[in-house]
């Protein structure tokens, strides 16, 4: 394991506020928003590039697979390098990747851009998890960590609807130009507000996997894998589902996704507050919401436009709390090795996004839109069962 060196008095003065933590939360928001943006622009992007929606969905898979590998070994890859410089560098990579996506004339260029994005996302996720306690005074360490992960949660539910709104108003490429500009801003912000974050020691690849021997950590990661895999099997293709099965127009889809996003932000903080008292209860509430919404959509005959929109809000409320609750579960299971469990959690989370979008793409191309919602419901139900029978601590 790596250990952080004590901050200098100058560093402490700079980190008394939560501004550096907010800057990192902005970075996690941007990397996750960038990863998932194809969800909200899937139909126009596929049409513009002359590919099927299933193939377009692979852009999510590519990013998730690369990020999963990189996040798991990120601390070992950067060794003793100052985390401040590493974060700035890979936010610049994110800026370039989104610009290249906006310029992509075909799927090959798009795939290359998404590989770059996956590297950036993996590095930021893999390092950000352990920075909360380093950047805040002891009494605010938990709040700092929650804020950092709130960037992930909020992006998961709000980034895509905002991007869909921009794309429907100005074209799908404009959404990626906006993300590129935001990445450039975040890079500068990190340079201004983030103090040096040196480390002592070096992590050998594979050492952190020993934390999986803790049954609480393993259960928490299993819950994450199941619910996230199911979620992205369905949510990646939620736009064509809403258009074909619920009869929503593109404008109404954008509005429904925006409502989903607002609900998700609320869910993030409500479930996050509950997670501080009981990680298990928080997980069951979050995952239970996903189970209820996806099951109703999957087996409700497509549902009418209004009821489908309401169910999407319930989905957002539940999934908005998944990141903070499952990460809190894994941290509570092994408080002495939070950095190791967080890195593995991030890797598993991203791998599940990748696998989920692949499964969803295969299902939607072979069995249609309703079938992907059934996959989503099944994955979430399995996660809920694990949460019922397992405990964060022995």
Model-derived features: positions:
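Conserved MFS/SLC helix-loop-helix module at the cytosolic interface between two early adjacent transmembrane helices
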Residues: 69-105
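Helix-breaking motifs and short loop linkers at transmembrane-helix boundaries and internal kinks
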Residues: 50, 82, 103-109, 247, ...
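Primarily marks hydrophobic transmembrane alpha-helices of the MFS/SLC 12-helix fold
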Residues: 84-87, 110, 280-284
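Cytoplasmic helix-loop-helix junction between adjacent transmembrane helices
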Residues: 113-152
């Amino acid at each position: 394991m790596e250990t952080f060196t004590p901050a200098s008095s100058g560093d402490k003065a700079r980190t008394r506020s939560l501004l550096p933590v907010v800057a990192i939360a902005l970075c996690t928001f941007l990397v996750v928003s960038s990863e998932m943006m194809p969800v909200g622009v899937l139909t126009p992007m596929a049409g513009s590039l002359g590919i099927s929606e299933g193939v377009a969905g692979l852009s999510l898979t590519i990013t998730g697979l690369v990020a999963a590998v990189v996040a798991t070994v990120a601390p070992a890859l950067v060794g003793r390098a100052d985390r401040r410089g590493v974060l700035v560098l890979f936010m610049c990579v994110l800026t370039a990747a989104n610009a290249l996506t906006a310029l992509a004339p075909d799927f090959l260029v798009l795939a290359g851009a998404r590989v770059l994005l996956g590297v950036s996302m993996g590095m930021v996720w893999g390092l950000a998890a352990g920075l909360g306690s380093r950047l805040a005074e002891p009494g605010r360490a938990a709040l700092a960590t929650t804020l950092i992960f709130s960037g992930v949660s909020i992006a998961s539910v709000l980034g895509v609807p905002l991007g869909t709104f921009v794309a429907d108003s100005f074209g799908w490429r404009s959404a990626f130009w906006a993300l590129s500009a935001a990445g450039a801003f975040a890079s500068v912000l990190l340079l201004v507000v983030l103090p040096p974050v040196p480390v002592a020691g070096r992590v050998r690849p594979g050492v952190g996997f020993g934390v999986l021997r803790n049954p609480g950590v393993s259960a928490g990661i299993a819950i994450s894998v199941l619910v996230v895999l199911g979620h992205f099997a369905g949510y990646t293709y939620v736009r064509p589902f809403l258009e074909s099965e619920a009869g929503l127009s593109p404008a109404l889809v954008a509005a429904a996704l925006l409502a989903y996003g607002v609900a998700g932000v609320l869910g993030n903080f409500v479930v996050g507050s509950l997670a501080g008292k009981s990680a298990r209860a928080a997980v069951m509430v979050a995952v239970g919401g996903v189970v209820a919404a996806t099951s109703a959509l999957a087996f409700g005959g497509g549902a009418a436009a209004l009821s489908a929109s309401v169910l999407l809000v319930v989905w957002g409320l539940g999934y908005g709390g998944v990141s903070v609750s499952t990460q809190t579960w894994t941290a509570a299971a092994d408080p002495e090795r939070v950095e190791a469990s967080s890195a593995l959690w991030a890797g598993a989370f991203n791998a599940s996004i990748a696998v989920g979008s692949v499964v969803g793409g295969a299902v939607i191309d072979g069995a249609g839109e309703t079938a992907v919602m059934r996959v989503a419901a099944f994955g979430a139900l399995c996660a809920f069962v694990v949460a019922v029978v397992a405990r964060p601590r022995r």
